[in-house]
Amino acid sequence: MSITSPPIEVSVLTDSIKNLLEKNFLRVVVKGELSNVSLQTSGHLYFAIKDSKAVLNGAFFHFRSKYFDRKPKDGDYVILHGKLTVYAPRGQYQIVAYALTFSGEGNLLQQFEERKQRLAAEGYFDPKRKKPLPSGARVIGVITSPTGAVIQDILRVLSRRCHQFQVILYPVTVQGATAAQEISQAIQFFNQNSMGVHALIIARGGGSIEDLWAFNEEELVKSIVASSIPIISAVGHETDFTLCDFASDVRAPTPSAAAEIVCKSSDQYRQELQNLRRYVLSHARQFIAAKKNLLTHWQRHLASVDFYHTAQQTLDYTRAALERGIETKLEYYKQRFAQYRRWLKSDVLIRIEKHLADLNQSLMLSIKNKIYTKKTSLNQLYTSCLKNELLNLQHHTQHSRNILSQLSRRLHIAIASSQQTHQECLVRLQNELSFTIHHLLTKAKERCQAIQEQASSLNPKNVLKRGFAQLFDFNKHFVIISAESLKQSDLVRVCLQDGEAVVSVKEVWLNNDKKG
């Protein structure tokens, strides 16, 4: 613009600068230290973000509705996502933020994404290596805290959905420096010990990214991938995602959902998959159509939204100025009132206080006289009533003594006549009680002996003593119960009463037919 150009109004120049900023800095990411933080009753946040060399004012509209669980304060180091604009009434440029991340959380999120990409590239999250859940799982290993609500939720769901199930709990800490190592050791324990577990559930309640960080450790991811037992990850709430979720064979949104998943049959899986497919397709179409309409709507009204934000910021500044003005006026009138009070107290208040003192003295004297008169009357009345009550009490006492003497004589006669009868009844009841107790004890001993004999007959070790044996595969991963699983030259581990032996299969017959 040359010197000879016609002058323009300040508002026109400001609008031009605003358009340039918003066009060239539509999306910016700024990091720095917060200062002058002010959260208004409207829910909007105003602040300044600074470093050692510069300061930038900013606003975050509707902050409280988006970040209701945490309030920033002066000195917090944050990362802001937003756009640059100009607040015209003050002629200052500012950032209008739409996302805020505290620095510590930002570092963890960055570390999470880097580790996720690296492990995914190494194949740890490959869907092809995930193991299917067994249909009708009945023995379930649960790795979680033994004292939290998580284990109770899992047991409650399993009790409702499964008629027969067995839960083997491996207690671990689910937060802190040692949590990942303890969970990894639990996975290794279930894999190394033949306990017949069909599936494992790793569970924890919700929390912040710091609380759930143990489930992002590389050690735990590798233990999950190496497990031969299918693992369900149920960590946090539905919106929480950890590396444990990506590495596990199945991810459940909550611990209760994990218990529901592990109890499902294959028919239920197929039916739910079909229902989910129909639901996703239907809602995806609706969602895309709605988002297209919403995008068109906001494109038309984008200019009006910016105007609303400017007006809202002006309103917040005006409200703050009015509040400061009201406080100033209140302080001024407090001082004036104190001054008037000092003036009045010097003359009028002195006379009023003297008159009140005289009235108080006269009133106290009158009250004392009244009290003395009433006290004298009450003493006389009390003495008269006390004498009458004493005479009545003496009369009733003598009458009660006469009645008590008569009742005592009658009671002695009644006791003497019924004592013999009661003694005979007591002897009879004692005999009946002794017989009943002896009969119940005899039946209880017989039942206990029968239970012991039944338990002894069901003990696998006792079965081995009768000449039977148990067959396992060579590595003792599973019990061999069918000849179909054997072939010639297989090595089989035989468990006998007093030891084990490894044998080689020479021939196998099925239903009297020679297999080879």
Swiss-Prot record:
Highest taxon of the lineage: Bacteria
EC primary class: hydrolase
Name this polypeptide is given: Exodeoxyribonuclease 7 large subunit
Keyword Hydrolase tagged: yes
Keywords annotated in UniProt: Cytoplasm, Exonuclease, Hydrolase, Nuclease
Main function: Bidirectionally degrades single-stranded DNA into large acid-insoluble oligonucleotides, which are then degraded further into small acid-soluble oligonucleotides.
InterPro entries xref list: Exonuc_VII_L, Exonuc_VII_lsu_C, OB-fold_nuc-bd_dom
Keyword Hydrolase: yes
Recorded GO MF terms: exodeoxyribonuclease VII activity; nucleic acid binding
